[in-house]
Amino acid sequence: MANIRKTHPLLKIINGAVIDLPTPSNISAWWNFGSLLGLCLITQTLTGLFLAMHYTADITLAFSSVAHICRDVNYGWLLRNIHANGASFFFICIYLHIARGLYYGSYLYKETWNIGVLLLLLVMMTAFVGYVLPWGQMSFWGATVITNLLSAFPYIGDTLVQWIWGGFSVDNATLTRFFTFHFLLPFIIMGTTMLHLLFLHETGSNNPTGLDSDADKVTFHPYFSYKDLLGFTILLATLSALALLNPNLLGDPENFTPANPLVTPPHIKPEWYFLFAYAILRSIPNKLGGVLALLFSILILVVVPTLHTSKQRSNTFRPSSQTLFWILVANMLVLTWIGGQPVEHPFIIIGQVASVLYFMLFLFFIPLSGWLENKILDWA
């Protein structure tokens, strides 16, 4: 008699996805981040659900309700600290996951890649509206500055901003709708993640060599299920350490002050995981230009598969493309640093150079490197 997990309508789907799934035998720890992102999503949804039970989406009560959660709710401080720092870990995992895709050429699975870019945009949107909810100074001014950017769009801009605000400034209506979006989006992310996995399992995973691995596949369980479990342990241990020992390390002290429309903070900046995009936005001395640069700093990922010029898929055997990849990583770190600095010399020019280099690497240097490597291979 056949095993129930292979015949039951529901269990056979799970079996095909996480038990008997044929997996390349040589995928490294860089392939752990997909499952870690799933863990982050579950952690964030559960902690967020319990926080939402005690949170009040009203400008007179929001800040107090967060304080109430931390002081009076059983383990409320822990829920809040895990949720706030879990967002940082979510972005660490998502950036490493994308970096893995760029390095090993996983982007050539176009459907999976494009849904991944959509997931990135959804997660960024969720994090942005979530940051507004505690209604501290940086929450309020961050919401004001970022939503105001939409006014740069010709003709419809001002109407669009007022429509999003639900009035003539960031007010109660804005907070209420941001809470609605923050609650709704994770479930949309879950659905999109299912699509991401569906398309991935159509082709199977890529591997570090970038070569076809049909000749050497192993079952996902027990080999990679246990490998993922090790990743889970490391992630949860690190997240727990941060949430328990130094929960405010990555936050902004300004957010411990209740929102005040009459007092502008000296430096308005988003959470650290948005600083690279914020630096690109600020490096262009034109409002619409800055908004478009901000948008394209993420959407440029969509054109990466089209700009793949190399005969080889992965960077494993391509030294010059490897060098450019690590220059891109260093450039991202520089942009992140610049995004947190005041708008003054020499930070302005460093930000502008780094922003130009960011786009040049994607659009020119990396495709050129692939083409040159092909030429060298032809001569060999």
UniProtKB/Swiss-Prot annotation:
Molecular function terms from GO: metal ion binding; ubiquinol-cytochrome-c reductase activity
Protein name from the UniProt record: Cytochrome b
PROSITE patterns: CYTB_CTER, CYTB_NTER
TM helices/strands, residue ranges: 33-53, 77-98, 113-133, 178-198, 226-246, 288-308, 320-340, 347-367
Record key words, sorted: Electron transport, Heme, Iron, Membrane, Metal-binding, Mitochondrion, Mitochondrion inner membrane, Respiratory chain, Transmembrane, Transmembrane helix, Transport, Ubiquinone
Keyword Transmembrane in record: yes
Cofactors demanded by this protein: heme b
Record bears the keyword Transmembrane: yes
Biological function: Component of the ubiquinol-cytochrome c reductase complex (complex III or cytochrome b-c1 complex) that is part of the mitochondrial respiratory chain. The b-c1 complex mediates electron transfer from ubiquinol to cytochrome c. Contributes to the generation of a proton gradient across the mitochondrial membrane that is then used for ATP synthesis.
List of residues binding a ubiquinone: H201
Family: Belongs to the cytochrome b family.
Residues involved in heme b b562 binding: H83, H182
GO cellular component, one term: mitochondrial inner membrane
Primary location group: mitochondrion
Gene3D superfamilies: Cytochrome Bc1 Complex, Chain C
